[in-house]
Amino acid sequence: MTVQRRRRIIKRRRSSVGLALVAAISFLAGMTDAIGLMSIGDFVSFMSGNTTRASVALVQGDAAQGLLLIGGLVSFVLGNAAGVMISIRFRPQAALLFVSALLACAALQEGQPELRFVSLIFAMGAVNASVEQIEGLPVGLTYVTGALSRFGRGLGRWAMGVRNTQWIIQIVPWLGMFAGAIMGAVLVREAGDLALWVPSLAALLLTAAAFQIPRRWQSRFIQSR
């Protein structure tokens, strides 16, 4: 086997592992978002929607709701920052472990919807530090607007004769989030408030799986320091 062929095989395997991780984390995000929406009434990973909802609430005179949503936006930003700091200080998998702990804390906050809302958003921000790219291609985990946009632009270029098909992977986060949201809705219907324990356990299992990924591959899933 030539060196070049070996490198291609390793790259293909590394990309497959990265995409599987992206799909799993997006599934986790979709599940958490659906549970948050159905149990609290607001999105916990869709910040574009929360931005619009905050603006509408303020204009309609609902200052309390508007400020809560703005607080959620701030929490999402801080969660991203915390996730990156943990990822750099330790390993990207540590961010997943942190998210699992945050989700468990949120599950314990029964009767405190505002605190649970902010905690869930912070967790969804932090999870984005787990995977930022696949072989140099940016991917989103807890939001799919950008992924669908990149998919659409890639489709347009392909229709115009550009045969680079790397854009196809952008559909993976959407599929993961869609499937996860269905699961989250089913969990709320069947288990009510207990549903939130499932994302916490799922994040813990994801952490265990992520620790099996070779360390030398991990640098390909996050932006350079």
UniProtKB/Swiss-Prot annotation:
Entries under InterPro entries matching the protein: DUF1275
What stretches pass through the bilayer? Answer: 17-37, 66-86, 95-115, 117-137, 168-188, 194-214
Q: Which family does it belong to?
A: Belongs to the UPF0700 family.
Q: What is this protein called?
A: UPF0700 transmembrane protein RA0705
Q: Which UniProt keywords apply?
A: Cell membrane, Membrane, Plasmid, Transmembrane, Transmembrane helix
Q: List the disulfide bonds.
A: none
Q: Which GO terms describe its cellular component?
A: plasma membrane
- Domain of life assignment: Bacteria
Localisation: Cell membrane
